[in-house]
Regions:
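Short catalytic/metal-binding and nucleic-acid-binding patches
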Residues: 1-363
Length: 363
């Protein structure tokens, strides 16, 4: 079945949660240990994490979850045009210059010469903010998931080719396998399932036994942030929004959203490390980690097809069947190709342009 055009799934002008995934070319292990050649490219996962931090600080897009594996990576993103709407023209110009600078400075990182954005001059900022057409185009790009993926994949590919001593047009050549895959998340149930699916990638691949053991994932950073707070005797009542700007998860969207008490509106980030301070699920951080821990241990101890036991009580509050939801997480990658959600959400959803129903595989 042909893959849907991006315009049929989501639009930068609307708030949308999306799961995206990109694979390295020819199933090569270009982000980890390649057993065939003996080369280890694990350090490239750090490149991805560093770039994610830069993108999260400048795009109008929330980074909800991520996982870097040896031949692919997963992200859960939420476009926030409402946050972009709160930025004045100067802020829009500054952010775009930081993402796509016309001038760069060279710094040495891990033995490599890396280009970083130079500080823009007033003239360079004026070239953007004094052009209404260009400014409107850039505002749209800042909440566009496709532009996020374009800059991320391009950066990693060019840096990897430079490391190999070649140019993008020759030598190592293409780094990524075609287009990135995208699945729109239609409801809270699918959003929680997708975040868990992404965070538990190392556990399903038998690379890690528990969530604490995983590396290069958003859950690892959330656990590290909580452990740091405990070690520093920080109050348990502290909000994830008020954590240190140096916390390991400072560039990630907060987990918890309180629909009753949280203020309305976009809630742009106060730290400048991420797009906004708005959470994405009605769970406390500890409850989310409890669910992931339950799933990870169930995956490790249960036989194929068996039902996980001792489900966290939070499922009752969310009105989610833990057995059905656990199966959704387990089969997420195979079941959902364009959109994800419960039966009612998928049945009522239509493609944006042609107004057709979405296809969902039976697993």
């Amino acid at each position: 079945m042909a893959r849907l055009a991006r315009v049929e799934l989501f639009d930068p002008s609307e708030i949308a949660a999306v799961h995206v995934m990109a694979k390295t070319v020819r199933h090569c292990w270009l982000l980890g240990l390649d057993e065939r050649t003996g080369k280890n490219f694990d350090h490239r996962k750090l490149w991805i994490e560093d770039k994610l931090q830069a993108l999260a600080a400048n795009f109008g897009i929330d980074l909800l979850a991520f996982a870097c594996m040896s031949n692919h990576f997963h992200l859960v993103l939420r476009s926030r045009p409402d946050v972009v709407g709160t930025w004045d023209d100067t802020e829009v110009a500054r952010r775009w210059w930081t993402l796509c600078p016309k001038r760069k400075v060279i710094r040495e990182v891990m033995g490599q010469e890396i280009f970083f954005p130079a500080d823009p001059t007033e003239w360079e900022l004026n070239s953007i903010r004094n052009d209404p057409v260009k400014l409107a185009q850039i505002r749209r790009r800042l909440s566009d998931v496709s532009w996020w993926m374009r800059l991320l994949c391009q950066y990693i590919a060019m840096r990897a080719n430079k490391e190999e001593g070649t140019k993008v047009s020759g030598g190592l050549g293409h780094f990524w396998q075609g287009r990135y895959k995208a699945v729109r998340l239609l409801d809270e149930e699918s959003l929680l399932a997708c975040a868990a699916y992404v965070d538990l990638n190392p556990n399903r691949a038998a690379i890690a036994e528990t969530i604490e053991d995983s590396q290069h994932t958003s859950v690892k950073r959330r656990v590290s942030a909580l452990q740091t707070e405990v070690a520093n005797n920080v109050s348990e009542d502290i909000s994830p929004i008020d954590r240190s700007v140096d916390a390991p998860d400072c560039f990630l969207s907060p987990v918890s959203v309180d629909e009753r008490n949280d203020p309305l509106g976009p809630r742009p980030s106060r730290s400048g490390k991420r797009c906004s301070d708005k959470g994405f699920i009605a769970l406390a951080d500890a409850e989310y980690l409890e669910i992931l821990d339950w799933l990870a241990r169930s995956t490790l101890s249960s036989k194929r097809g068996s039902t996980p036991e001792h489900a966290p009580k939070v499922f009752e509050r969310l009105c989610i069947d833990p057995v059905v939801w656990a199966e959704m997480v387990k089969n997420f990658g195979r079941k959902f190709k364009s959109v994800a959600g419960n039966a009612k959400s998928i049945e009522s959803a239509r493609t944006r342009k042609s107004r057709r129903r979405y296809y969902c595989a039976r697993v």
